[in-house]
Design a protein with these regions (language model features):
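N-proximal low-complexity "stem/linker" segments adjacent to membrane-targeting elements
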Residues: 1-25
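Short, acidic, metal-binding catalytic loop of nucleotide-sugar glycosyltransferases
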Residues: 24-33
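A conserved acidic beta->alpha catalytic loop
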Residues: 40-49
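Conserved donor nucleotide-binding strand/loop of the catalytic core
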Residues: 52-72
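Glycine-rich, basic loop-to-helix element that forms the pyrophosphate-binding segment
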Residues: 67-85
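Short aromatic/hydrophobic "clamp" motif used to bind/position activated sugar donors
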Residues: 90
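Conserved donor-nucleotide/metal-binding helix-loop-beta segment in metal-dependent transferases, i.e.
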Residues: 104-119
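Short beta-strand-to-loop element that shapes/binds the nucleotide-sugar donor at the catalytic cleft/hinge
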Residues: 117-129
Length: 129
């Protein structure tokens, strides 16, 4: 296994259900060695309370909060959270993304200096004709 680790960057606003699902997929399928950096953009759905609970039990989590009342937006959060990440390798990971087994190994295997690596999935159309 590579000794390199990834900082997963996860900004969110009122996506608690998906954020829990996404976090659990990272920890279940990739373990606890990777950092997750969360940003809460003035949520009112319990996101901040949940993030505080996760932070207490997971040492590789950082949490940041916009107390509002104005939202900062996803572009601000990606920039801010990248600055807070402690690893050289960062992965933008939306709150509704799921980490499949070996995602980290595949990303790190393909990564070369100066290159950008992306992962995606293809979904069937929601409304096929």
């Amino acid at each position: 296994m590579s000794d390199k680790v990834i900082s997963f960057i996860q900004p969110s606003r009122n996506n608690l259900k998906y954020l829990e699902w996404s976090y659990n997929s990272i920890r279940k399928n990739l373990g606890y060695r990777h950092e997750i950096v969360f940003g809460d953009d003035f949520s009112d759905d319990g996101t901040w309370k949940w993030l505080q609970k996760i932070k207490k039990k997971d040492p590789n989590v950082q949490i940041f909060r916009n107390k509002g009342p104005e939202r900062k937006g996803i572009v601000y959060w990606y920039d801010f959270l990248c600055e807070k990440a402690t690893n050289d390798i960062v992965m933008f990971f939306h709150a509704d993304m799921y980490a499949c087994p070996n995602l980290d190994k595949e990303i790190l295997r393909k990564l070369e200096k100066g290159k950008v690596v992306t992962a995606t999935r293809i979904e069937p159309p929601l409304h096929p004709s």
